[in-house]
From Swiss-Prot:
GO terms for biological process: cellular response to N-acetyl-D-glucosamine; cellular response to neutral pH; cellular response to starvation; chlamydospore formation; development of symbiont in host; filamentous growth; negative regulation of DNA-templated transcription; negative regulation of filamentous growth. Transcriptional repressor that binds NRG1 response elements (NRE) of target promoters. Involved in regulation of chlamydospore formation, hyphal growth, virulence, and stress response. Plays a key role in regulating true hyphal growth, but does not regulate pseudohyphal growth in the same fashion. Directs transcriptional repression of a subset of filament-specific genes such as HWP1, HYR1, ALS8, HWP1, or ECE1; via the TUP1 pathway. Functions with UME6 in a negative feedback loop to control the level and duration of filament-specific gene expression in response to inducing conditions. Its main location: nucleus. One of its GO terms (cellular component) is transcription regulator complex. Disruption phenotype: Exhibits a high degree of filamentous growth and leads to avirulence in a mouse model. This is Transcriptional regulator NRG1. Coiled coil: none annotated. It comes from Candida albicans (strain SC5314 / ATCC MYA-2876) (Yeast). Keywords: Metal-binding, Nucleus, Repeat, Repressor, Stress response, Virulence, Zinc, Zinc-finger. Signal peptide: none annotated. Residues 104-131 have a biased composition (Low complexity). InterPro entries: Znf_C2H2_sf (IPR036236), Znf_C2H2_type (IPR013087).
Length: 310
């Protein structure tokens, strides 16, 4: 900052006023002019010091050099001053708005068209005065989904036979055109087939009807000696004994009992009973076998004694 003293200037001004001067006194200090109006008539003229005399009479700490650097520094100081933000007028910021989309495009907005779409060439002043609401800016990016057909207009799904039938021929202007059915998705209605039929269509085997006929032919073409057939499972046997033994499986009858005295196991087949009896009379249980013999002998002796007594 520049420092200057104004004592000589004030003394000269006081002397001029005491003399009754009615002229205008102007003092230029850093671009500022002070004027003192007087009466219309001038009684006496008093010469005032010039601007150069005032500058030379004021003691300055440094030399005063009028240059553009001081003005540039002052302008920079005023520009970078932290008080300019509060002293200046409030700045109006314009938010960036998305570009308007044409209404003829397939991706049209679902919400009502805002002001930016109605007049795409808006001026900055208009956008500042009429900002778009938040919900309108948000819905500008909401695009409509492709329209789905009405449920009544949806064609019914093609059946299994229609999708696998032979290609159809259609004449258009005398020219034959081959139309092949497109392989559609398998719907639940087309999957209600027999597993045997689906397997026959996929692997080339016989159909369900042919399988049933072949099963009947196999039963008739079996060995003619198997005349005895089970009534429950239709299994055939060569002898009636085999059939009777097989019937015990269905009835649950266990006619054969283990001959061991303390064992009460029963079996439907005799060979199974004999195999079980060997568990009691094997080589590891010789003592048990001897006991069994003694028990049998005692049992036979008691029977003989009872007979003799009778």
């Amino acid at each position: 900052m520049l420092y200057q003293q104004s004592y000589p200037i004030t003394n000269k001004l006081l002397n001029a006023s005491a003399a009754g001067s009615t002229s205008t006194a102007s003092i230029i200090d850093g671009g500022c002019t002070l004027s003192k109006p007087g009466s219309g008539k001038t009684k006496s003229t008093t010469s005032l010091p010039s601007f150069n005399e005032l500058l030379t009479s004021i003691p300055l700490p440094n030399e005063f050099k009028p240059s553009t650097k001081n003005t540039n520094q002052a302008a920079a100081a005023t520009a970078t001053s932290p008080y300019n933000y509060y002293m200046g007028p409030p700045a109006q910021h314009r938010l960036p708005t998305p570009p308007p989309y044409p209404m003829s495009s397939p991706t049209t907005a679902t919400a009502a068209t805002p002001l930016s779409q109605q007049s795409p060439h808006l001026q900055p002043q208009q956008t500042l005065q009429q900002p778009q609401p938040y919900h309108q800016q948000y819905y500008n990016y909401q695009y409509a989904a492709p329209p789905y057909p009405h449920p009544s207009q949806v064609p019914p799904p093609a059946s299994y036979q229609q999708r696998h039938q032979q290609p159809m021929y259609q004449n258009t202007n005398g020219v034959p055109i081959i139309i092949r059915p497109s392989p559609g998705l398998i719907t639940p209605t087309s999957t209600t087939f027999d597993h045997a039929k689906i397997r026959s269509n996929s692997t080339g085997d016989l159909s369900a009807n042919s399988l049933a006929l072949s099963s009947n032919n196999n039963t008739q073409s079996k060995d003619p000696r198997r005349k005895h057939v089970c009534k429950v499972c239709s299994r055939s046997f060569t002898t009636s004994g085999h059939l009777a033994r097989h019937n015990r499986i269905h009835t649950g009858e266990r006619k054969h009992q283990c001959p061991w005295p303390t064992c009460e196991a029963r079996f439907a087949r005799q060979d199974n009973c004999n195999q079980h009896y060997k568990t009691h009379t094997n080589g590891k249980n010789k003592r048990n076998r001897q006991q069994h013999r003694t028990l049998e002998a005692s049992h036979v002796g008691t029977k003989y004694n009872t007979k003799s007594l009778v």
